[in-house]
Amino acid sequence: VYDGDTPVNERKRIRDRANIILTNPEMLNGTMLPNHSKYGFDFIFSNLKYVVLDEMHTYRGAFGSHMANVFRRLSRITEYYHAVPHFLCSSATIANPVELAEKICGQPFASVTKDGSAASERNYLLIQPPKISGKDQQYYGQESIVSVAAQILPQLMEQRESFLAFAKSRKNVEVVLKETRDRLDAADFLTTVTSDQISGYRGGYTPIERKTIEQQMIRGDLLGLVSTNALELGIDIGSIGVTVLIGYPGTRSSFWQQTGRAGRSKKSCTNYLILDHLPMDQYIGLEPGWLFDESSEHAVIDPDNLLIELAHIRAAAAELPLSLDDIARFPDLGETIPVLMKMQEVRSQNGRFAWAGGEYPAGDFSMRNIDKNKYTLLNQETGKTITEMDESQAFREIHEGAVYIHDGESYRVVKMDLESKMAYAIPFNGNYYTVAGGETNIHVIHSQKEQQWNRIRVQFGDVNVADYVYMYKKLQFHNLSLIHISEPTRPY
């Protein structure tokens, strides 16, 4: 394994000796390609026979678009070293596996679809939260899916069922985790299990935290995890007997991927779907056969997104000088080269375009999204890092006055410094958490094509998206009662 956690001396041994290297997109983008002529990477690229892309269905949207451009850069490097690798991809069920593979890898593909996985009896249960009235009516007339999940999970733990519960947001992961632990700790809840036998698992936890949680799950120290879609992937956490989906995840592909984490042995498994108040969830409640009768959705990427492609053109120029032949890989190269020359980031050299900018353009962007600005949240009392997140999420989650929950523990944000991109929080024992409110404004810059669909006009083109946060709600744990609506010290 060659990733960010691999010790320096181990990295050298892997570069010198390994025949098979397991790595991740960030390591390929930020270390291997920029240093292709150093540290023995030239030997690896010269002898590269196979490139295997696992979990291909996750490479959609901005992430998949970045990955396609990383492979464009990889093809330049392997061509430079006279290597012609074969590409192999594995994917969960999607409607367009061949199309997605060809867009990401830039090579023709053939599809192999025979299912050889273990088959077991699978049970599916839909849960419609009960209707409520009175002061809690603000939650669309039904009990929240978070509260329902916090009632179900202790019962699964009491039955010693190993489970994964999937929430649709990091916030909901933490609220479900805290409310479940609170129920387990309550004096009137008699059980043989304890609150430390359930944990969260999501982005925002450190690699060490995630690895510790994975090992605890494998050993049986934990009975279950509350996770975002981070655990849709094939991370080894032992045998799972039950999944609990806290709301429909949005696509059939995600539904099957999440429920597919249970029953990977030949034992029967149970999958719960708690229906939210949203129209899609309620439609499934009325027509559950829709989940099983229809095919999965298409996975969509846009490798030619100008912001993403430009970031990788800059990185490619620093790896090897660009030429007009590279237009076959980067369609917008002819438009971007004059801009980069004007910015003095590339210079003309013997009919090619060599990098003249900063030392490390591959480190100037995030592969997981377009937003490259990162914010850090610190525990003001200990100085330790609680989490890191991108700017758009930071404005919603760690603005001044926000209550941020990490591994079931609450922190109140007391300061946010936009210049240093740091926020500071203190431990908080209050009975509420916060949810940001705002609006998203979309301005159409250029419409490339449009079509009338019934009474709806559909356009495709370039847009400018602006998110605003101007208020936040204080919601009480366990019943979602609205305590107060506040304004941040400044709008974001």
Predicted regions and their residues:
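Conserved helix/coil segment N-terminal to the catalytic DExD/H
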Residues: 6-47
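Conserved helicase ATPase core of P-loop NTP-dependent helicases/translocases
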Residues: 10, 205-227
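A short beta-strand element within the Helicase C-terminal
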Residues: 233-247
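Extended Lys/Arg-rich polyanion-binding regions
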Residues: 268-271, 277-295, 312-323, 333, ...
